[in-house]
Amino acid sequence: MKNYIQYLTIGALLMGSLTSCNDFLDREPLDKVTPEKFFSAEADLAAYAINNYKFVTVDDKYGINLFGKDNDTDNQASGTSNSFWIPGEKKVAADRGEWKWEDIRSCNYFFDQVLPRYEEGAITGNQDNVKHYIGEMYVNRAYSYFQLFTKFGDLPIVTTALPDIQGELVEASKRQPRHKVARFIIEDLKKAEDMLLNNPPGGKNRISKNVAYLLHARVALYEATWEKYHRGTAFVPGGSGWPGKDAQGYDADVEINYFLDEAIAASKFVADQMVGNLAENTDTPEGMNASLVSINPYYTMFCDENMEGYKEILMWKKFDESLGVTSNLQMELCRNGGGSGWTRGMVNSFLMRNGLPVYASGSGYNPDWEKEGVVATVQNRDSRLGIFTKNSIGEYEVNPAFISDVERRYQFALSAFNGV
């Protein structure tokens, strides 16, 4: 009997130790924040939102970078050929190519977690800022959708982070006609416009109300002109050869007018604020004097270190070597123009100083100037052409006042895309 009691005691102790062990293991990790706890404060939303900024910007890679996007258009050309224009060479990717939904899923996950808590008033912090960061995420989703939209047109409209269940994924993957996708993007931006602050925490390094309106105008104008100039083709709902199953009552005139009206209204909201607030172009060949004081605000707006003071700049990226946010673009442009340059048509789109186009009678333009080189070609033009045109190859001066142990800033006596 005594042994039996001993066995029971030992067994009870073992069971107790196992239970306490399970209790010890069944705890939230101390080195990580769980989803249930993360979206509970203003700072959480701020961090998540800015981590989902996917805007195409200048990075630290060598080359012309972002500004090569216009290559192979009527405005800009590179020194290499592009197979895009060769029949049969523009092929569908063998894998998923650009069909990537990770960014949109990240936004949808945010809304799944945050919107119920926001409606319950369960997120701590400054409520104006909380509301603002939710607005930022609507812009993030709209932007990510717009990036896909310009590549594919018809898209699935997905508003939640879907589970890994085949049936649900297949149903949600059905593509909607492009005009419905564009309307969905604009609806997201309207939600953002209602929630965003004019002057957000972080200044113009973060999304603001005006940024949402700017993107709103761009999306609307893009879709209006696309549907207008592709009417009746396979690239719009119901057009000849359109691969969609159901145009769902698509009316080209109604859609085109809707998107044009949206573009006009959104543009006007921003433009009205800029009246009398644009940077002045004082028409000087240099942007700063010897003391590095701006003598041409329009010029220095494109090469300043701090863009907060320029009303017409709605959002900008701050480069900071200590934070590892750097760029090699200026060096590349100075050295060889980044292997890219403006087309003759682009240059000749700039007016003469007297306000007349180069082809007009009385403009004063001489076509023979083109034979003499860039300097002669751009003479007597709108001064903005000279600011953004490198007019001498391999010839520039560095102002020593720009160089210190802390920072390297260069002023080129001969413009080399100084504004970029």
Where are these regions (language model features)?
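C-terminal motif of bacterial Sec signal peptides marking the signal peptidase cleavage site
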Residues: S17-S20
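Hydrophobic helical h-region of N-terminal Sec-dependent signal peptides
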Residues: T9-L14
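Short edge-strand/loop segments of extracellular domains
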Residues: A161-Q166
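Bacterial N-terminal signal peptides that target proteins for export
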Residues: M1-L8
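An aromatic- and glycine-enriched ligand-binding surface/loop that stacks and positions planar moieties
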Residues: N22-S83, L155, T159, N210, ...
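Conserved, well-structured interaction surfaces
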Residues: S40-V58, A77-F152, E168-K209, V374, ...
